[in-house]
Amino acid sequence: MSRVGKAPVAVPSGVTININGQSVEVKGPKGTLSQDIPAPITVAQEGEELVVSRPDDHRKNRSLHGLSRSLVFNMIEGVTKGYTINMEIFGVGYRVQLKGKNLEFALGYSHPVLIEAPEGITFAVDGNTKFSIAGIDKQQVGQIAANIRRLRKDDPYKGKGIRYEGEQVRRKVGKTGK
C-alpha cells in the first residue's frame, strides 16, 4: 500500500466533512473547499478520521491513492490554518504596492504590472520589496505565486527578480574582459 495513502487523515474539531459520491466537501473556520476524488478511490469517515482506500493494486489506483489522501489532507489544513507564501523582490527600482485588493508591480518594464486577487486570495505588502499571498486553497495560492514569480524570474548574473522568501539563487560569473 501507499505509505502516504494508508495513513488516516485526522479531522480536527470545528471541521465538518460531507462526502457525496466522489465529491468531498470540507467546511472549517476559514471557509469551504470541495474536491472530486478520482473514480476508483473511496473516502470514508470513521469517527474523527478520514480513511482513503483503493479497490486493488493496479498501477493507476496505487498512484491515485496517495494523491487523493494528500488532496483531502490539504483541504483540511487549508480550512483550519490556511496557506501563506512569502515572496521578495530584488533589483534597483523594483517594487510592489497594494492597490485596493490587487498588487501593482514596477519591474523595469515600460508599464506597471497589475495582478488581480481572485476570490479567496488575499495579498499583503511589507515595505516596497516584500509581499505575501494567503488563502485556503494550497493549489491556488501556489499557482498565483508561480505566476507572479514568472513576471520577472531571477537573473543568475545580477540576482534581480522575484523569488520566494529564503530561496537561494545560483549566481553565475559574467564574461571577463580582455
Curated annotation (Swiss-Prot):
Q: Which InterPro entries match?
A: Ribosomal_uL6-like, Ribosomal_uL6-like_a/b-dom_sf, Ribosomal_uL6_a/b-dom, Ribosomal_uL6_bac-type
Q: Which domain of life is it from?
A: Bacteria
Q: Which GO terms describe its cellular component?
A: cytosolic large ribosomal subunit
Question: Mind listing the GO biological process terms from this record?
Answer: cytoplasmic translation
| Pfam families associated with the record | Ribosomal_L6 (PF00347)
| Keyword Protein transport annotated | no
Report the GO molecular function annotations. rRNA binding; structural constituent of ribosome
Q: Which UniProt keywords apply?
A: Ribonucleoprotein, Ribosomal protein, RNA-binding, rRNA-binding
Member of which family?
Belongs to the universal ribosomal protein uL6 family.
Instruction: Please explain the role this protein plays, according to its UniProt record.
Output: This protein binds to the 23S rRNA, and is important in its secondary structure. It is located near the subunit interface in the base of the L7/L12 stalk, and near the tRNA binding site of the peptidyltransferase center.
According to the record's subunit comment, the protein's assembly and interactions are: Part of the 50S ribosomal subunit.
Protein's UniProt name? Large ribosomal subunit protein uL6
Q: Which organism is it from?
A: Corynebacterium jeikeium (strain K411)
Tell me the gene name.
rplF
